[in-house]
Design a protein with these regions (language model features):
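Alpha-helical scaffolds flanking conserved acidic
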Residues: 79-93, 138-145, 151
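Alpha-helical phosphate/pyrophosphate-handling elements in metalloenzyme active cores
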Residues: 42-44, 48-88
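Non-catalytic interface/linker regions that flank or bridge core catalytic/transmembrane domains
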Residues: 1-38
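Conserved small/polar residues in nucleotide/adenosyl-binding loops
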Residues: 239-241
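His-Asp-centered metal-binding catalytic motifs of divalent-metal-dependent phosphohydrolases/nucleases
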Residues: 63, 85-105, 121, 235
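Histidine/acidic-rich helix-loop-helix segments that form or flank divalent-metal centers
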Residues: 127-217, 224-227
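Active-site flanking loop/helix segments enriched in acidic
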Residues: 20, 27, 35-58, 108, ...
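An active-site-proximal "capping" alpha-helix that borders the catalytic cofactor pocket
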Residues: 62-68, 116-129
Length: 241
C-alpha cells in the first residue's frame, strides 16, 4: 500500500512548512484546530493596522515550524531528543493557542470568568487525547511543564519561547511595525541546554536583547495602541449591556 503523501504549506514568513507526521496532519484537519482559521491573532488591532487580519491558525503553524528548527539545532549540538519527544513538542506548540475564543484576548475574561485560554487549550488537548487514544499524553505533559526534561516545557512557554518568537515576527510583518522584526533564526541557532535548562550561548546575547526590546516596543506601539484598546473596551461594554 502506497504511503499517504503529507502536505507542504506555504507561509509568507518562513516559506515552505512541512508536515512530517500523520498525527500532526490529523490534528491540523480536526475541527478543533480548523476553527483557529476564524480566530484573529490580534483581536481588533486591524482597526489600527489594516493588514493585521492574520489568524491563530497561521501563528500555530509558524510556531510548529520554528519548534522543528529548534529541535534540529539542539540535536546538532548533541542534545538527545527522541522521535517521540520531537513529535510531542510539535503537538504541544501547535495546540498551545487552541483554547482562544473570538477576538482572541479581548473577550478572554468576559465569556468565562477566571478562566484563561491556557486552561481552555489544555481542555481541548485532553479531549483530543481521548479521541486519539492517548497519543497526546506526552505533549500534554510538556505543555503542563510536568515532563522531567524541563527545557522542553521552556521551549513551549517561557520568557524566550517559540510562541513569542513567531508572534513577534508575524505580527510585525502583518502590521508593518518593523520594531518587531526579530531574527528568529539567529536566536534559535544560539539555543543550548545546560543542567536541563534552556539557555542561549553568550554570542547570542545581543540577539536576545533585541528580542526583549522588540517585544517592549510592539506592546507600546501595537498591542496597547489606544485605538485598539478603546475598541476592545467598547466591545466588552456591548456584551455587558
Amino acid at each position: 500500500m502506497k504511503a499517504k503523501k503529507l502536505p507542504v504549506l506555504n507561509d509568507p514568513i518562513y516559506g515552505f512548512i512541512g508536515i512530517d507526521s500523520g498525527i500532526i496532519f490529523e490534528l491540523l484537519s480536526h475541527p478543533f484546530f480548523q476553527r483557529l482559521r476564524r480566530i484573529s491573532q490580534m483581536g481588533l488591532s486591524y482597526l489600527v493596522y489594516p493588514g493585521a487580519r492574520h489568524s491563530r491558525f497561521e501563528h500555530a503553524l509558524g510556531a510548529m515550524h520554528l519548534m522543528n528548527k529548534a529541535v534540529m539545532v539542539l540535536r546538532k549540538k548533541g542534545i538527545e531528543i527522541s522521535k517521540a519527544e520531537k513529535e510531542a513538542l510539535s503537538i504541544a506548540i501547535l495546540l498551545h493557542d487552541i483554547g482562544h475564543g473570538p477576538f482572541s484576548h479581548a473577550l478572554e475574561e468576559c465569556i468565562l470568568i477566571d478562566t484563561h485560554h491556557e486552561a481552555l487549550s489544555l481542555g481541548y488537548m485532553e479531549l483530543l487525547n481521548e479521541q486519539f487514544d492517548g497519543k497526546l499524553s506526552l505533549a500534554i505533559q510538556i505543555f503542563n511543564g510536568q515532563y522531567p526534561r524541563k527545557f522542553m516545557g521552556q521551549l513551549v512557554a517561557s520568557q524566550l519561547d517559540i510562541d513569542r518568537l513567531d508572534y513577534l515576527k508575524r505580527d510585525s510583518f502583518y502590521t508593518g511595525a518593523t520594531e518587531g522584526n526579530i531574527n528568529t533564526q539567529r536566536i534559535i541557532e544560539m539555543f543550548f541546554v545546560v543542567d536541563d535548562e534552556l539557555v542561549v550561548e553568550e554570542k547570542g546575547l545581543f540577539s536576545v536583547e533585541k528580542f526583549i526590546m522588540a517585544r517592549r516596543l510592539m506592546y507600546w506601539q501595537v498591542y496597547l495602541h489606544k485605538t485598539g484598546v478603546a475598541a476592545e473596551l467598547l466591545l466588552l461594554s456591548l456584551i455587558h449591556i
